[in-house]
Curated annotation (Swiss-Prot):
Heterodimer of LeuC and LeuD. Its cofactor is [4Fe-4S] cluster. NCBIfam families: leuC, PRK05478.1, PRK12466.1. SUPFAM superfamilies: Aconitase iron-sulfur domain. Binds 1 [4Fe-4S] cluster per subunit. This is 3-isopropylmalate dehydratase large subunit. It comes from Vibrio vulnificus (strain YJ016). It catalyses: (2R,3S)-3-isopropylmalate = (2S)-2-isopropylmalate.
Amino acid sequence: MGKTLYEKVYEAHVAVAAEGETPILYIDRHLVHEVTSPQAFDGLREKGRQVRQVSKTFATMDHNVSTTTKDINASGEMARIQMETLIKNCQEFGVTLYDINHKYQGIVHVMGPELGITLPGMTIVCGDSHTATHGAFGSLAFGIGTSEVEHVLATQTLKQARAKTMKIEVQGKVADGITAKDIVLAIIGKTTAAGGTGYVVEFCGEAITDLSMEGRMTVCNMAIELGAKAGLIAPDKTTFDYIKGRKFAPTGADWDAAVEYWKTLKTDEDAKFDAVVTLNAADIKPQVTWGTNPGQVIAVDEPIPAPESFSDPVEKASAEKALAYMGLEAGKSLSEYKVDKVFVGSCTNSRIEDMRAAAVVAKGRKVASHVQALIVPGSEQVKAQAEAEGLDVIFKEAGFEWRLPGCSMCLAMNNDRLGPHERCASTSNRNFEGRQGRDGRTHLVSPAMAAAAAIAGHFVDIRDWK
């Protein structure tokens, strides 16, 4: 019987498979940031161990860096300590670090792909739940805990049981104005936020292969939001064209050999998945979350659902709680509610394509007077590219704040956050209670939808904007 893409990558990395034991996988790339690494390095130090493969380990600062200044003190004492500790640890253990003053600094899941650190067929881990982003390249990428970070630093391996497999196929082409973010939110709306639990997902279908690499990264980034361990997309010419010429990409004969191997990284026709989910791309409309998990999502032209519309008692109770927290009334349109803040950024939507999409909407318009709108590029490289294209000028003239790279308002670990009951149109990946600030209300949308909400002062259907 044939094998799935996941099975091919998984099996190629089994280093030890003792009977009755969880297999040990070799890890090709380990990405490190300031929040989940301090205790891991302390563990190495206490046990007298070194980092086994420094050439496969890359660190950056992203979670709590300020987006208004390069001052390491700007986000508070805890943030300063974490960043100073990362500098010390990387110096001591010989790990490459792109700190806040480096031209390659950025959100770890933006920085890795744009430098060619992320390549098809690799195993990639990071102490961060959205590591699945890198699966857009046909790599097996997933988040790990701090004790596992230490284990990978010390051994370049990790115990990892084989997951179940799920195929999510988005058939046909999407309508104009429908983005990767809309696709993945529609998927999660169908599967629910727990539908992928225990699975590694492969995204496929014409609507997926039509996406750019930036779009594919958006989709895989949110695989974790449907409960999956990881999400993969088979590499193709789009993938190879994106990688070629990047800093850590193979060159010459090595490139030719790599591409030949990468072309084998696809699910065999006779492979069997444990579960299959199918969506019709033409049915997908601009999506907006209304609740407190990404599965609580509707098309922008649909009314806010009533709890009674859910047959499952758990979903019904969750909907009641979410509506109360979000300050929403069932049956109303989301466009009836004012937004207070808008955030375009995060490892989901902070790449150059996302900046361009928001700029198209912003150009020649003005942010509503009651709205604070932040544009936070995902890396120094994205920021430089956007500025070379004049996007920063478009944003600033429209009344958006053009910020420095970092995770920013996605998780409120710096000073970018919501106040109590403030409503935010956000391009990030999680709308949990308090995620963007205590009692803050988060609605997940695409960059174009977020920019339009900033200008209108409330949610609008981007398809009506010309």
